[in-house]
Amino acid sequence: MRRTALVLTASAPEGRASELAQFPSAVPAPHPPPVSLPSPTAAPGFAMGNVPSAVKHCLSYQQLLREHLWIGDSVAGALDPAQETSQLSGLPEFVKIVEVGPRDGLQNEKVIVPTDIKIEFINRLSQTGLSVIEVTSFVSSRWVPQVAAGATEISVFGAASESFSKKNINCSIEESMGKFEEVVKSARHMNIPARGYVSCALGCPYEGSITPQKVTEVSKRLYGMGCYEISLGDTIGVGTPGSMKRMLESVMKEIPPGALAVHCHDTYGQALANILTALQMGINVVDSAVSGLGGCPYAKGASGNVATEDLVYMLNGLGLNTGVNLYKVMEAGDFICKAVNKTTNSKVAQASFNA
């Protein structure tokens, strides 16, 4: 049986963390309002959101949806992987998706999301086949009051930019490394895996361009202290396939691709292209957020993460296995968007729900 890891991120290295409450993952949440979605087995002709009517009634379009989108209990696309991957080289057979919506997504909301809504949201995500879900962060309530919980894995947040490090975690890069070492060491003693993040890997809102060498140095430090995986974040979404390739080439001289992940925001619409570039270079772990939730309180103008729905749709189309049920991800996204009264940023969801 697939197990879902609930991840706690550590973003307050100077001891300003609020008191933690154990996350009640097994506590039944109140029944939410029913989600209105077309059935995965719906007959041809069901409404498809903002897709033009003429296209909706095209038989070939409906066939595409039956094979490629409404995959029911399937964990991979219905298309033949041999047919799809023959067009692109170097792609992994399996891609692990790290869902960051509950943590990175909800931290940017202006209102505090009620605990029962968070629990129901996470419970829904845990039923999608996602193997890793970041549920929250522990940080000072003075800085980011929206998050509080506990988990079975931790992450630490470094940065390749001095200015961003001071804005985001209130200390220099060097100071943060010392704090992170203590956290990772303590986690290892408790047999809790630690993941390392490098923010601003492709650009900084305060310093502009970041050199690949700087990203490599921070990544090497995190990997050396015991982080089993390093997630390289395009925090403000300014990267392109070219800059992604150059950055990864540098980092991969020090860290094997099997220990790397990418975390792309979609500010300039480049997230999926950047992810595809990373996959072709041997990366097989990708962070995403359902409905494209997110942003960063300390990176003004940055849009949300790449939408999990859009990522899974692309990976299905490439014939790659993710273990994720796209239909159930869309249900979870619809639930949280209604709960926080916002419109989904997922193109797949926008094209799939009733207008």
Q: Language-model segments: what does each one mean?
A:
Residues 1-355:
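Catalytic cores and adjacent flexible loops of soluble metabolic enzymes
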